[in-house]
Regions:
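Substrate-binding groove/exosite segments of carbohydrate-active enzymes
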Residues: 1-7, 11-175
C-alpha cells in the first residue's frame, strides 16, 4: 500500500473499521503479456511484480515508491525496464521518460541520476547510462527505430563524457 495512516474527519461517530475502504489507484497500462504456471509460488511472485509495476508509473515514468518518490532514477529504470516492458506496453511512458533524460544532459555531456532532475546532483554510469539502455530496450520491445534515431545524439554526447573517464576502455574513478 502507498500509505501508512488514514485520517477520516468530519464524522459524527467513529466508523466501523470493516466499512472503511481503500481504493487502488494505478496507471492503466496496456497488458503486453501474461504468466501462469503450475507453481503457486511463481504465480504469486509474478502477481506481486505485476502489481508493483502497475503502481509505479503514476507520474509518467517509473519510480520506486510513488507515495514518497517523485523522481525517475536511471538505476531503478535499468533494474526494471526489461520486466516492465515485457509485462506492459510502456512505449508512451518510455517516450516521455526518454524525453526527460534528453532534457537533463549537461553541456559537458554529464547527466544526473534522475530525470526529471530538479537539482544539480550527478550520477554514476548505471544511472546515467539509462539513456542508452532504455532507448535500446524500447526499440527491441516495440520495434520503433525512431527511438534510437531521436536519442542517438544524446547517447553520443554522454559517451563522449564517459570516454574522458576511461582508460583502455575501462572506467576510472567516476567524478
Amino acid at each position: 500500500h502507498g500509505f501508512r495512516y488514514v485520517k477520516i474527519s468530519n464524522l459524527y461517530e467513529a466508523p466501523n473499521p470493516a466499512s472503511v475502504k481503500a481504493y487502488l489507484i494505478h496507471t492503466d497500462f496496456e497488458l503486453n503479456s501474461g504468466f501462469e504456471c503450475s507453481d503457486t509460488d511463481l504465480n504469486r511472485i509474478h502477481d506481486m511484480v505485476f502489481y508493483t509495476l502497475q503502481c509505479l508509473g503514476l507520474g509518467g515514468y517509473l519510480v520506486d515508491c510513488p507515495q514518497i518518490e517523485r523522481l525517475g532514477y536511471g538505476g531503478d529504470g535499468n533494474a526494471s525496464t526489461v520486466t516492465a516492458q515485457t509485462m506492459f506496453n510502456l512505449a508512451p511512458l518510455y517516450s516521455n521518460w526518454l524525453d526527460a533524460w534528453s532534457d537533463v544532459i549537461r553541456e559537458d555531456g554529464s547527466m544526473p541520476h534522475t530525470a526529471p532532475n530538479p537539482y544539480s546532483a550527478g550520477g554514476g554510469p548505471y544511472w546515467c547510462g539509462f539513456i542508452i539502455s532504455a532507448s535500446w530496450h524500447t526499440y527491441q520491445n516495440y520495434g520503433d527505430i525512431s527511438v534510437l534515431e531521436k536519442y542517438y545524439p544524446v547517447m553520443q554526447k554522454w559517451l563522449g563524457y564517459v570516454e574522458k573517464y576511461s582508460v583502455d576502455g575501462l572506467l576510472k574513478r567516476w567524478p
